[in-house]
């Protein structure tokens, strides 16, 4: 899944968090996203 750069790091529909420095696909805390860098928070926040 690809993060939306407008989300600003909040949880989006697929439970993915966007890395602020790379908003177009570096996500964490969800099995459905590729995590190259980890960011704070949980998929339920």
UniProtKB/Swiss-Prot annotation:
The keyword Ligase does not apply. Expressed by the venom duct. GO terms for cellular component: extracellular region. Keywords: Bromination, Disulfide bond, Hydroxylation, Ion channel impairing toxin, Neurotoxin, Secreted, Toxin. One of its GO terms (molecular function) is toxin activity. Disulfide bonds join 3-16, 11-28, 18-33, 27-39. It is found in: Secreted. The modification 6'-bromotryptophan is found at residues 37-38, 44. The modification 4-hydroxyproline is found at residues 23, 40. The keyword Cell inner membrane does not apply. The cysteine framework is XII (C-C-C-C-CC-C-C). Mu-conotoxins block voltage-gated sodium channels. This toxin reversibly blocks voltage-gated sodium channel in cephalopods, with no alteration in the voltage dependence of sodium conductance or on the kinetics of inactivation. This is Mu-conotoxin-like Cal 12.1.2c. It comes from Californiconus californicus (California cone). The lineage of its organism: Eukaryota, Metazoa, Spiralia, Lophotrochozoa, Mollusca.
């Amino acid at each position: 899944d690809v993060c939306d750069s407008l989300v600003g790091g909040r949880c989006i529909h697929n439970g993915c968090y966007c890395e602020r420095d790379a908003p177009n696909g570096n996500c964490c805390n969800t099995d459905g996203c590729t995590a190259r860098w980890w960011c704070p928070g949980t998929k339920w926040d």
